[in-house]
Amino acid sequence: MTGAIKPVFPLASNTWDGAEEAAIQAVVDSGMYTMGPKVAAYEKAFADYFGSQYAVMVNSGSSANLLMIAALFYTKQPYLQPGDEVIVPAMSWSTTYFPLQQYGLKVVFVDVDIDTLNMELTKLEAAITPRTKAIFAVNLLGNTNDYGAIKQFIDGKNITLLEDNCESMGATYNEKQCGTHGLMGSYSSFFSHHMATMEGGCIVTDNEELYHVLLCLRAHGWTRNLPKFNQVTGEKSDDPFEESFKFALPGYNLRPIEMSGAIGIEQLKKLPSFVEQRQKNGQYFQTLFHNHPYIAIQKEK
């Protein structure tokens, strides 16, 4: 029986140190392993860092995309209905697309620009029809979309802008964080991404109703994580038993574990240095493959 082959180029390097290890140990010592106060503290820090009103942590970036799409069906005035068209780039990770298909939406693919690997703007504009209800923009491999142009395309139209920012945490467009240009944005903290929380994802929004819907859908559709006055059920009962077992929406269980929240608090402090190092790595590869006869590399926008 042969042992595992060690890769020449690892997928990612470890960015944890004593701070993350101490955070994990503190959770172990507390005896509270499921989603709790550390996750809540991370969500507050995450929202503050990226300039959003609300952040909801989940167990992966893929779960963030699923929850984000689901939430658009469960507001009082739904943003989406089955059969609506949603425009997406032709290049992304699979779980950008699968939630759209799972909710009965018509996925409209737009080809990407060969240099930036984001949606080619003239093709994006041409893809918009009266049936288009959302654009799900993906900031691929650190490159931001041209949100000025995209917002011009949808100005005056009933089209929702969403962002899959799982691969571009820390990128900005016009000094505004990517993930915050649309109604909602998703992030990933998988171990090879900009921050590593073992597994993890996050959604940001400034919309209070969507925030409440996300909280409900994230954990079984129950009401126990909602504030007393909320936009899903109105006013909650003061009876804790009643609210602990009241299910208002057809939810999932996408909760993160408490350790991931604790690690995220420490990783978020280091994010600027992580982004800086990744930019240096990107510049190195751009130089290395410049004018290569067989390899075309993504160009920074």
For every predicted segment, state its role.
Residues M32, G36-E85, P99-Y103, F109-D111, ...:
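Phosphate-binding glycine-rich loop
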Residues M1-M32, P37, A248:
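N-terminal "arm"/small-domain region of PLP-dependent enzymes with the aminotransferase-like
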Residues V39-K44, S52-V56, G61-S62, T122, ...:
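PLP-dependent aminotransferase class I/II
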Residues T197-G200, A262-G264:
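Adenylate-forming
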Residues E163-T197, H212, E243-K246:
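Conserved active-site segment immediately N-terminal to the catalytic lysine
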Residues Y74-L140, T144-N165, T172:
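PLP-dependent aminotransferase-like
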Residues Q102, T180, C216:
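Phosphate-coordinating loops and pocket residues in cytosolic domains that bind phosphorylated ligands
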